[in-house]
Amino acid sequence: EPLLQMDFVTEFFRFAKEKGIHTTLDTSGNTFSLDEDYQERFRRLMDVTDLVMLDIKAMDGALHKKLTGQANEPILQLAHWLSDHGKDMWIRRVLVPGLTDSEEELIGLRDLARKMKTLKRLEVLPYHTLGLFKWEKLGVKYPLEGVPTPTAEDVARAEKILEVEKYNNK
């Protein structure tokens, strides 16, 4: 999570900008805070950030907590902050059958997206099991064992509900 190393990322991005390189921050947003000290450091980072890619795993707070062990309030606060401060963003959603693909979840994300003034892209990322071998090597039970990958029809349905075409042609 790059926001855990905000000072380093700020300096790295500053160097990149001096070289004319576009900067993108890919974040879960779960460390975002409205604390004054945090905000000062965060604003400095945003001064050298061109785009923020924000992963929103679930709109429902209880579901988000179940999936990640964390509240989703900081993530939603970050989305609103980016929109209110004119910072371009992409929102990404991993589509996990039976967990993040309900109509209620997707409509909630769609409604948030409609409010975001700086949203440039809304992506549906189909859940996959490519990293399953890592869990097996660690001898740890995979928490999503037995969950199928979404079908092309599942992804198309989610994209339709989310109205991705409104954002992905910008």
What are these regions (language model features)?
Residues 111-114, 120, 136-161:
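A structural motif corresponding to the C-terminal lobe/cap of the Radical SAM core domain
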Residues 69-72, 136-141, 166:
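Glycine-centered secondary-structure boundary/capping sites
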